[in-house]
């Protein structure tokens, strides 16, 4: 372990803050850039996660203050701010917590005049997906789904899709 640490820390990649210097054994796929691991391995089952029940009171004033400052900065500098919730596994998204979180962020963004999209509400026709398209219950997508989602995200943000048919109106649908 010591020799490996010396080898890594003396490399040009490490000195230049490159991810190439980091060995990550449990990422599920190669590092693709900008914090993205292209996970392509199918798992026998999802990596379990400790899913925490949604609790609005757990959002600190500091976080809300940071959000407000971000909104103010964007408005002052004529920057369009769009907030999104990326999709998680279908099984996890229907447990009620996603719906509660989505309702909270919908209200918060409406209060500040910020556009918000909950991509858990994408129809299955728009983005076909199953739990098998994810690495874990938290919503880390396998690469193929991440590619498809990125295309849909871009089409929504660029206003190139019919949002009235791309999204379900409620989680019950």
Regions found by a protein language model. Give the residues of each.
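Short, local alpha-helical segments
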Residues: 51-54, 86-92, 131-136
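Secreted/periplasmic serine-hydrolase-like ester/acetyl group-modifying domain
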Residues: 1-76, 165-173
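Active-site segments of SGNH/GDSL-like serine hydrolases
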Residues: 70-96
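Acidic-and-aromatic substrate-binding clefts and catalytic sites of carbohydrate-active enzymes
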Residues: 57-63, 90-99
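Long, well-ordered mid-to-C-terminal structural blocks that present hydrophobic/aromatic surfaces
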Residues: 63, 81-90, 105-106, 159
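Short amphipathic alpha-helical segments, especially helix-boundary/capping motifs
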Residues: 43-47, 79-82, 125-130
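C-terminal regions of proteins
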Residues: 95-173
């Amino acid at each position: 372990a010591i020799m490996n640490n010396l080898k890594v820390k003396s490399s040009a990649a490490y000195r230049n803050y490159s991810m190439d210097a980091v060995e990550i054994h449990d990422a599920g796929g190669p590092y693709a850039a900008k914090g993205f691991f292209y996970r392509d391995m199918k798992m026998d089952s999802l990596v379990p996660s400790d899913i925490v029940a949604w609790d609005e009171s757990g959002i600190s004033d500091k976080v809300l203050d940071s959000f407000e400052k971000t909104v103010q900065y964007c408005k002052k500098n004529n920057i369009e701010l769009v907030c999104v919730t990326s999709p998680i596994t279908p099984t996890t998204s229907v447990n009620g917590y996603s719906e509660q979180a989505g309702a909270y962020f919908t209200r918060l963004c409406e209060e500040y005049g910020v556009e918000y999209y909950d991509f858990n509400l994408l129809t299955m026709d728009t983005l076909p997906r199953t739990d098998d398209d994810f690495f874990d219950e938290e919503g880390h997508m396998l690469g193929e789904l991440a590619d498809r989602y990125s295309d849909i995200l871009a089409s929504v943000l660029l206003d190139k899709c019919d949002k009235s048919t791309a999204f379900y109106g409620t989680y019950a649908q």
